[in-house]
Design a protein with these regions (language model features):
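Polytopic alpha-helical membrane-helix bundles and their juxtamembrane interface segments
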Residues: 1-212
Length: 212
């Protein structure tokens, strides 16, 4: 994507850091939403509308998750699920360097991690059980498919970073008490791995679409 969009999005992500643990506000929502929205704009300028759509869906998810309440959480999770489905569509459009053997090998850790959520996450999700389960299936599919492209390391790293970010977010939301001393550190790690994931996926997909 254009350098201004990549660096601008990263800079905006840095500006959001002091707002990570503040109460919801218009400014907090704006700062949380803008980084990936700028990535989306850069991807659109670079001639990748499907990638821009995936990033735009994620930006809407950021906006929803910047607010409090179950409805906002469900809206955010739905937006990110759509974003992952659009990432899947982007990956499927690649020229066809997928390695079936690598695909099967790469699936193992992702499937094991997804299955493990039935042990450490499911009992804590309450009424959100089935939305969370569906989201786990979708992001697992995106991660496995991304790792099936051995000639696209940025895509693989981006997907892995996204899975790590969502793993940490699940721990933050469902497993850590409000007064847990690790909450600030986990919140910071979620944001860093998330922005890293979006930047890597965007750059990786654009590189594959326009090699060289």
């Amino acid at each position: 994507m254009p350098l201004f969009a990549l660096l601008g999005g990263i800079a905006l992500a840095g500006l959001y850091l002091p707002w990570l643990d503040r109460a919801p506000s218009v400014m907090r929502s704006l700062l949380k939403t803008l980084p990936v929205a700028v990535f989306a704009l850069g991807s659109l300028i670079a001639g990748a509308p499907l990638l821009a759509a995936a990033l735009a869906a994620s930006a809407l998810g950021d906006l929803a998750l910047s607010r409090d309440g179950e409805r906002a959480f469900l809206a955010g999770m739905g937006a990110f699920a759509l974003g992952h489905l659009l990432y899947i569509a982007n990956i499927l459009q690649l020229s066809g360097n997928a390695n079936p053997f690598f695909f099967e090998w790469a699936a193992i850790p992702f499937l094991l991690l997804a299955a493990s959520t039935e042990i450490w996450l499911r009992p804590h999700t309450g009424a959100l059980l089935w939305p969370v389960r569906l989201y786990v299936v979708i992001i697992t599919a995106m991660g496995v498919l991304a790792l099936s492209e051995p000639d696209a390391p940025l895509i693989a790293l981006g997907a892995a970073s996204f899975v790590l970010s969502d793993l940490l977010l699940a721990i933050f939301i469902f497993r850590l008490a409000e007064d847990h001393p690790a909450r600030k550190s986990v919140s910071l790690a979620v944001w860093i791995t998330y922005i890293t994931a979006q930047a890597l996926l965007a750059e990786g997909l654009l590189t594959q679409v326009s090699p060289g």
